Amino acid sequence: MNPNCARCGKIVYPTEKVNCLDKFWHKACFHCETCKMTLNMKNYKGYEKKPYCNAHYPKQSFTMVADTPENLRLKQQSELQSQVRYKEEFEKNKGKGFSVVADTPELQRIKKTQDQISNIKYHEEFEKSRMGPSGGEGMEPERRDSQDSSSYRRPLEQQQPHHIPTSAPVYQQPQQQPVAQSYGGYKEPAAPVSIQRSAPGGGGKRYRAVYDYSAADEDEVSFQDGDTIVNVQQIDDGWMYGTVERTGDTGMLPANYVEAI
């Protein structure tokens, strides 16, 4: 349905319609309110939803107020109130170098996630410090205290020569050393003496390590998870004596770190 003209009230057809100032006009009816000069979309100026030309556009005027004692007092009072409020706000925010952030659901979720990550890291560090440098998978088997260890190590050192397996690796030195031979005036240097370690024997009981272990004393051996322990002899419920097949080292090892094959 075609609208009516805001000036003459007649129907405005699309071919002569001007849409401006929230109203519809005929092109001929869209003129200045004062001088009746026809206007267009480029040279009109609107005031109170009425078109004006540049020359007759209403100018805004300001009312002069006399500087009476009462007005001066109100002006001074307003300035004092502004200064008081400014100082109050300044003192209240003094020393605060942060801006207030709204506690939105997204920020609450991020804060909760950070707290969970901090708790996880704390528990990881706590478990590592409790397990020590030789921690394996899961909970580390508890070691006997130093008093229990010293109670059976002393008699073991006295009986150790009687319990060394016959197949334990020892350092052997060849009984016969090559003699330097001389040919005329030249003397051939003797070959260097080599110290060989005999391979561990395959007899006796065989165990497999289920945890990593670092030797805490000279009479103990170190091994890794998965190493094979051969020539194993049971000392008591907590300790064994055997040879690590991978390294050839022989000594004491905790019984709860290995399992029978």
Swiss-Prot record:
Modified residues (Phosphothreonine): 68, 104
Modified residues (N-acetylmethionine): 1
Biased composition (Basic and acidic residues): 121-130
Function: Plays an important role in the regulation of dynamic actin-based, cytoskeletal activities. Agonist-dependent changes in LASP1 phosphorylation may also serve to regulate actin-associated ion transport activities, not only in the parietal cell but also in certain other F-actin-rich secretory epithelial cell types.
Gene: LASP1
PROSITE patterns hit by this protein: LIM_DOMAIN_1, LIM_DOMAIN_2, NEBULIN, SH3
Biased composition (Low complexity): 167-183
Residue numbers bearing the Phosphoserine modification: 99, 118, 134, 146
One function term, GO molecular function aspect: actin filament binding
Keyword annotations: Acetylation, Actin-binding, Cytoplasm, Cytoskeleton, Ion transport, LIM domain, Metal-binding, Methylation, Phosphoprotein, Repeat, SH3 domain, Transport, Zinc
A single cellular component GO annotation: cytoskeleton
Biological process terms in GO annotation: monoatomic ion transport
Subunit structure: Interacts with F-actin. Interacts with ANKRD54. Interacts with KBTBD10.
Locations listed in the record: Cytoplasm, Cell cortex; Cytoplasm, Cytoskeleton
Pfam families documented for this protein: LIM, Nebulin, SH3_9
Protein name from the UniProt record: LIM and SH3 domain protein 1
Gene3D superfamilies in the record: Cysteine Rich Protein, SH3 Domains
Domain of life of the organism encoding this protein: Eukaryota
Transmembrane segments: none
N6-methyllysine carried by residues: 75
Modified residues (N6-succinyllysine): 112
Residue numbers of N6-acetyllysine PTMs: 42
Database matches in InterPro entries: Lasp1_SH3, LIM-SH3_domain_protein, Nebulin_repeat, SH3-like_dom_sf, SH3_domain, Znf_LIM
Swiss-Prot/TrEMBL Nebulin repeat ranges: 61-95, 97-131
Stretches for region Disordered: 111-186
The LIM zinc-binding domain, residue ranges: 5-56
Location of the SH3 domain: 202-261
